[in-house]
């Protein structure tokens, strides 16, 4: 989910993967 990765980019790499995949 590229959109989520961009939205949570400020959270950090770990946050991108965790939150991005969770909301995918």
Swiss-Prot record:
pH dependence, record text:
Optimum pH is 5.0 for NADPH-methemoglobin reductase activity, and 6.5 for NADPH-diaphorase activity.
- What is the protein name for this chain? Flavin reductase (NADPH)
**Ligand binding (NADP(+)):** 9, 11-12, 14
Q: In which tissues is it expressed?
A: Detected in erythrocytes (at protein level).
Q: Which family does it belong to?
A: Belongs to the BLVRB family.
**What is the stated purpose of this protein?**
Enzyme that can both act as a NAD(P)H-dependent reductase and a S-nitroso-CoA-dependent nitrosyltransferase. Promotes fetal heme degradation during development. Also expressed in adult tissues, where it acts as a regulator of hematopoiesis, intermediary metabolism (glutaminolysis, glycolysis, TCA cycle and pentose phosphate pathway) and insulin signaling. Has a broad specificity oxidoreductase activity by catalyzing the NAD(P)H-dependent reduction of a variety of flavins, such as riboflavin, FAD or FMN, biliverdins, methemoglobin and PQQ (pyrroloquinoline quinone).
Reaction equation(s) it catalyzes: reduced riboflavin + NADP(+) = riboflavin + NADPH + 2 H(+); bilirubin IXbeta + NADP(+) = biliverdin IXbeta + NADPH + H(+); FMNH2 + NAD(+) = FMN + NADH + 2 H(+); FMNH2 + NADP(+) = FMN + NADPH + 2 H(+)
- The source organism is Aquarana catesbeiana
Give Gene Ontology CC terms. Answer: cytoplasm
Q: Where in the cell is it found?
A: Cytoplasm
Q: What is the lineage of its organism?
A: Eukaryota, Metazoa, Chordata, Craniata, Vertebrata
Q: Would I find Hydrolase among this entry's keywords?
A: no
């Amino acid at each position: 989910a590229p959109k989520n990765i961009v939205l949570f980019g400020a959270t950090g790499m770990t946050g991108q993967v965790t939150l991005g995949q969770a909301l995918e």
